[in-house]
Amino acid sequence: MADADLQPKKPKKALKAKTAEGEALLFALAEDRVAIEGVEPEIDGGRFAIKRATGEPLTVSADIFCDGHDKIDAALIYGPANLDPSKWSEARFEFVTNDRWQVTVSFDEPGPYRYSIIAWRDLYATWRDEAKKKRDAGKLTDLELIEARELVKKAGASGRGAKGDQRALAKLLERLEKHAAKGDQDGQYQLMQSEEVTQLLEAAGVRTNLSRYPGSVPVWGDRGRAPFSAWSESFP
């Protein structure tokens, strides 16, 4: 199979309905094991709206962390205030330093918007990091590679990702199992560490312990330029 077959399909801005329903259930059952604190900007706990001109960048930052040593990831979910949150857009946060993460978005049309934050344990990123350390130390075993195949199976069963990702995951699992049948540890390892697989599992992997910031923050998109937008984060 060509590596192009593993490329995740271009995701739509909005979550798919099937994905949204599944994640809505996860929100309801979430243990909130990933903490989301110190969200900025937010005025009086969300009582007043942040103001931005259309097209003007809005940088959101937060402290995001969890217990243990697992890798985590997070995303800003945002959209028109009158739109079902399951249809909001999603933008991945970037790690800054310590527990601080941030992301920058903008709004194309004037009007009321809202945003919130979701975060989860990224078991694939955790596996990738730990497997590299073990391989570098000459201690990689079949157990780590069995775990890798299980991650791919769970991703395939999750229903996440854009159309076509499930087919790519099935082909990935087929390749991994062929390497395993030949006892080819290096083939499995190299495939799971490839950029194509990383992108695929970022798009379609399981979001373990999916947690959500309680509530959502209002944003008002002004038409044209807002010369005193910095003040709008301090005063209603």
For each predicted feature, which ranges?
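N-terminal structural segment of carbohydrate-active enzymes
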Residues: 2-35, 41, 53-82, 87-236
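Short, solvent-exposed beta-strand/turn "edge" segments of beta-rich domains on protein surfaces
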Residues: 47-53
